[in-house]
Swiss-Prot record:
Keywords: Membrane, Mitochondrion, Mitochondrion outer membrane, Phosphoprotein. Phosphorylated by AMPK. Upon stress, phosphorylation at Ser-100 and Ser-235 by AMPK is sufficient to induce mitochondrial fragmentation. Pfam families: Mito_fiss_reg (PF05308). The modification Phosphothreonine is found at residue 27. Mitochondrial protein required for adaptation of miochondrial dynamics to metabolic changes. Regulates mitochondrial morphology at steady state and mediates AMPK-dependent stress-induced mitochondrial fragmentation via the control of OPA1 levels. The modification Phosphoserine is found at residues 38, 100, 107, 221-222, 235, 258, 270. GO terms for cellular component: mitochondrial outer membrane. The keyword Phosphoprotein applies. This is Mitochondrial fission regulator 1-like. It is a peripheral membrane protein. The keyword Lipid metabolism does not apply. Belongs to the MTFR1 family. Its main location: mitochondrion.
Length: 289
């Protein structure tokens, strides 16, 4: 028997290498039936627009609906697409044709619009926040000015000359910003050249221990301690030169306090209110005595 013998297809075995190519494709790539298209019949559509054509849609209408550019008046193949500026349908036709098939593209756009962040709302929120911060700064200025004017009344200096001569406690940068714009309204001082500071730090405001509760008595005591330590370290220096440097440092410190910029309005308001209530408590204690 010859090796190259042609075997007809109908004599091939239904399995193995001689199996049909169609069966191989069907086994490796199973095909599922396509979903059936469902249609909705409009009530009394034959009396309105369909006279000679039967109102039965076909599969060609599916492609028409998919290619629809947000038009709700052409839903079946028998309809004619008029121009937008010439077509003036009656309200009944518009309601019936819009109810036949929903406009899926419009609903998708509405969903995307809901998912996207509202840019106008965000811009409005930022504008409100900026306006609120501006109002807070204005309120801080008004409260600080009122507190400073109340502190300069004769009742504040009635306790004696000790309160006038003693420096104010170190409340931090917020108190410095309070006095910065109040002093300019009371007295106008000429600008003084700030001398060069020595290498040894003698400023009370530069040390963080000044704002602690145990160091809130006076700033003069800490400056005297620094001066004593400096004199002990430099025993061969002239005492008069040290006192002159100390006086210059004190003047530059007062000038720097008056030139400080405004800080956070919230911190300024809280500090002014705290001072105001402290003054009220002092007045009550004086009246009780």
């Amino acid at each position: 028997m010859e090796a190259n013998v042609t075997i007809p297809i109908w004599q091939n075995k239904p399995h193995g290498a001689a199996r049909s190519v169609v069966r191989r494709i069907g086994t490796n790539l199973p095909l599922k039936p396509c979903p059936r298209a469902s249609f909705e019949t409009l009530p009394n559509i034959s009396d309105l627009c369909l006279k000679d054509v039967p109102p039965v849609p076909t599969l060609a209408d599916i492609a028409w609906i998919a290619a629809d550019e947000e038009e709700t008046y052409a839903r079946v193949r028998s309809d004619t697409r008029p121009l937008r500026h010439t077509w003036k349908p009656s309200p009944l036709i518009v309601m019936q044709r819009n109810a036949s098939v929903p406009n899926l593209r419009g609903s998708e756009e509405r969903l995307l619009a809901l998912k996207k962040p509202a840019l106008p709302a965000l811009s409005r929120t930022t504008e409100l926040q900026d306006e609120l911060s501006h109002l807070r700064s204005q309120i801080a200025k008004i409260v600080a000015a009122d507190a400073a004017s109340a502190s300069l009344t004769p009742d504040f200096f009635s306790s004696g000359s000790s309160n006038v001569s003693s420096p104010l406690p170190c409340f931090g940068s917020s108190l410095h910003s309070t006095t910065s714009f109040v002093i300019s309204d009371i007295t106008e001082e000429t600008e003084v050249e700030v001398p060069e500071l020595p290498t040894v730090p003698l400023l009370c405001s530069a040390s963080p221990e000044c704002c602690k509760p145990e160091h809130k008595t006076t700033c003069s005591s800490s400056e005297e301690d620094d001066c004593i330590s400096l004199s002990k370290a430099s025993s061969f220096a002239d005492m008069m030169g040290i006192l002159k440097d100390f006086h210059r440092i004190k003047q530059s410190q007062d000038l720097s306090r008056s030139l400080l910029k405004e800080e956070d309005p919230a911190v300024l308001i809280s500090e002014v209110l705290r001072r105001k209530f402290a003054l009220k408590e002092e007045d009550i204690s004086r009246k009780g005595n």
